[in-house]
Swiss-Prot record:
This is Aminomethyltransferase. The glycine cleavage system catalyzes the degradation of glycine. It comes from Chlorobium limicola (strain DSM 245 / NBRC 103803 / 6330). GO terms for cellular component: glycine cleavage complex. PANTHER family: AMINOMETHYLTRANSFERASE, AMINOMETHYLTRANSFERASE, MITOCHONDRIAL. Keywords: Aminotransferase, Transferase. Its EC number is 2.1.2.10. It catalyses: N(6)-[(R)-S(8)-aminomethyldihydrolipoyl]-L-lysyl-[protein] + (6S)-5,6,7,8-tetrahydrofolate = N(6)-[(R)-dihydrolipoyl]-L-lysyl-[protein] + (6R)-5,10-methylene-5,6,7,8-tetrahydrofolate + NH4(+). Belongs to the GcvT family. The glycine cleavage system is composed of four proteins: P, T, L and H. GO terms for molecular function: aminomethyltransferase activity; transaminase activity. InterPro entries: GCS_T, GCS_T_bac, GCST_C, GCV_T_N, GcvT/YgfZ/DmdA, GcvT/YgfZ_C, TrmE/GcvT_dom1.
Length: 362
C-alpha cells in the first residue's frame, strides 16, 4: 500500500485512513458533514496526491493527444487546461482526465488514482504510431493538494503575496516559486467552489501544506478527506469513474456530450460515439428521495408501473440540502426533471423525483 508525502500529517491529525486506489488516504477528520460545510462556507485543504501524473512530450505530442482523447485539444493554449476523456474503440470510458498544456511539445496529465496503471498502459499502447512522442510517469515524485472554498483567495494572497493567483481564470494555470521550489497552480477543482489545485515535488509538500493550514486558520480552514470530496462533487453532479462513467458507459449517455467533439478529426472511439449519437438510450440524471433512506450504487429505479428503468450511480445525504440525493443511469424518456420515480432500498420502494443538475448552484 502506498502513502502520500502527507501521510504522517494525516495520521497525527487523527484522520480515519482507508485504502483508496492503492493508497492509504484520509476519508475524514472531524466528520464528513463538518468538512463539507467548511468547503462551502470557508475553505478546505485536500490531499489528492494519489492521482496519477504523466508527462507527454514531443513535437507530435499535441497531435497524439488529439487522437487519444475526445475533446478538442487544438483549442487549448499554453497555460490552459482542459477536461477530457479517453475512450475504448467501443466507446466505453478508459478514464476522465485533465490535460495541462505547458507548451506545444509538453503536456501534463492528471488521471484517476485507481486507473493510473491502466491509463499508462493504454497511452503507451498507442504512442508508438507518433514518432518522437514520449510518456513519463511522475506519480511517485509529485504531490497534489487542492485548496477550495470561498476563502481560498484570501489564503492564497497570504501565502503567495507576490503572485496574484486570484487573477487566474477557470482552467488556467501558471508556474510559481515558493522558497525556491517550482509549483504549478491551476484554477481547477472538484467541489464547485472557488479554488486551486497545486502540484509540487513530494519533498516540498509537507511544508506548503502546513503553511496553507496556518494561513487559513483565521478563515476557518479545515483538512478535508475523501468522504466530503465525494459529497461535494455529487452535489455538483460531477462524474466519478466507476460510478457515472466506466468502461461500459458511452459519454453521450452520461451528460458528457460537451466533452466529445465529433467535428474534430479522428479519435479513438469516435465511430462508436457516432452510433450512440444517432440513438442514445440512456442518460445520467440527478434525483432526490422523500424520507431519509439513502440511495446507493446499483440500487434499481422503477416507474409507476414498477417496471425497472435504471440504476443508481451515486447516492448520499446532501449536507447542503439535507435530503437524500443521487445520480442514476436511466432510460432517456424518464430523465426529464420533475419525473416521478421509485428507488428500491432493501426491499422497500421509496418515492423520488428526477432533479436538474447541479443540485447546488454555486
Amino acid at each position: 500500500m502506498k502513502k502520500t508525502a502527507l501521510y504522517s500529517w494525516h495520521e497525527q491529525a487523527g484522520a480515519k485512513i482507508i485504502d483508496f486506489g492503492g493508497y492509504l488516504m484520509p476519508v475524514q477528520y472531524s466528520g464528513i458533514i463538518a468538512e463539507h460545510k467548511a468547503v462551502r462556507e470557508a475553505a478546505g485543504l485536500f490531499d489528492v496526491s494519489h492521482m496519477g501524473n504523466f508527462y507527454v512530450r514531443g513535437v507530435r505530442a499535441g497531435e497524439f493527444l488529439q487522437y487519444l482523447t475526445t475533446n478538442d485539444l487544438s483549442k487549448v493554449s499554453d497555460g490552459e487546461a482542459q477536461y477530457n476523456l479517453m475512450l475504448y474503440t467501443d466507446g466505453g470510458v478508459v478514464d476522465d482526465l485533465i490535460i495541462y498544456r505547458i507548451d506545444a511539445e509538453t503536456y501534463f496529465l492528471i488521471v484517476n488514482a485507481s486507473n493510473a496503471q491502466k491509463d499508462y498502459a493504454w497511452i503507451q499502447k498507442h504512442i508508438g504510431a507518433f514518432e518522437g512522442v514520449s510518456l513519463e510517469d511522475r506519480t511517485d515524485e509529485l504531490s497534489l493538494v487542492a485548496l477550495q472554498g470561498p476563502m481560498s483567495g484570501a489564503i492564497l494572497r497570504k501565502v503567495f503575496p507576490d503572485e496574484d493567483c486570484n487573477t487566474l481564470a477557470s482552467f488556467r494555470f501558471r508556474k510559481v516559486y515558493y522558497n525556491g521550489t517550482e509549483l504549478l497552480i491551476a484554477r481547477t477543482g472538484y467541489t464547485g467552489e472557488q479554488g486551486v489545485e497545486i502540484c509540487l515535488p513530494n519533498e516540498a509538500a509537507l511544508e506548503l501544506w502546513s503553511v496553507l493550514m496556518k494561513a487559513g486558520e483565521e478563515y476557518g480552514i479545515q483538512p478535508i478527506g475523501l468522504g466530503a470530496r465525494d459529497t461535494l462533487r455529487l452535489e455538483m453532479g460531477y462524474s466519478l469513474y466507476g460510478h457515472e462513467i466506466d468502461s461500459t458507459v458511452n459519454p453521450l449517455e452520461a451528460r458528457l456530450k460537451w466533452v466529445v467533439k465529433m467535428e474534430k478529426g479522428p479519435f479513438i472511439g469516435k465511430e462508436a460515439c457516432r452510433q450512440v449519437e444517432l440513438n442514445p438510450r440512456y442518460a445520467v440524471a440527478g434525483f432526490s428521495l422523500d424520507g431519509r433512506a439513502l440511495p446507493r450504487q446499483h440500487f434499481r429505479l422503477y416507474n409507476s408501473d414498477r417496471q425497472e428503468i435504471g440504476t443508481v450511480c451515486s447516492g448520499t445525504l446532501s449536507p447542503t440540502l439535507q435530503e437524500p440525493i443521487g445520480t442514476c443511469s436511466i432510460l432517456r424518456e424518464y430523465s426529464r426533471p420533475g419525473t416521478h420515480v421509485m428507488v428500491e432500498i432493501r426491499g422497500t420502494m421509496h418515492q423520488g423525483v428526477i432533479r436538474a443538475l447541479p443540485f447546488v448552484q454555486r
